[in-house]
Structures are given as structure tokens and as C-alpha cells.
Amino acid sequence: MATYKTASELTKMMIDYLGQRGMEVWRNNNLAVKGRAFIGRKGVPDIIGYDRKHGQFVGCEIKKLGDRISPEQFTFLTQLGLAGGASMLCSQTSDETIKLEIFKDGETKIFSWRESEKEFRQT
């Protein structure tokens, strides 16, 4: 059974999970700073990196319970998946459920987190 996780906890969980599966990934801090103009691209995922074996770009957006994906984030993930990258959306949808959606090559696969196994399983 999953318990409520913060965005930071979900991010760490996904960085560890993807790293164990051959991905070189890191947190992409893309936050606005008070008093400074935003310099960057809107919609870039919270976690970015690449597959060590194939060199494929990987992007994973994290959403804690109650958060929603922005139009810019949706567009970025869609374009990444259509361009041959692996785009992911990891979201906690209830206190018990963490869902991972992977969009790659025009196809979406949905997985659920198994806390006891520390593993996602396709649903």
C-alpha cells in the first residue's frame, strides 16, 4: 500500500527506479525565482536524462496528489514521445495509488506502483 508522498519523495523514488533500470537521470530544477525573470523553457519535465544503452532521451513529470499537468508539460511530453524519446508521467492519484504513464513511439502504457515490491507493474 502506498502512502501519501510529497513531490520531492516521488521525484527521488523515480530517480532511483529509473537509475536501477539503466537510465542516467537527474532532477531538472526549472523553478521561478522571486525578483528574477524566468529563463528557460516552460513544460520541461522534473526529471530528465537518457537511456545508457540506447542514448534515448527520457523525461518524467512528477505530480503529487491533487496536482495537474499544465498544457506546456503535456505538449512537451507528447512531442518527446512522438519524436522517439520516452516521456513519462508519474502521479499519485490517491493515498494508495501511484501511477506511471509511459508514452513512447505513439503508444501509451500504464503501470501501478507495488510498494511491497518497490516495482511498477503494467495494468
Identify the function of each model-found stretch.
Residues 1-123:
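Catalytic phosphate/metal-binding cores of nucleic-acid and nucleotide-processing enzymes, i.e., regions
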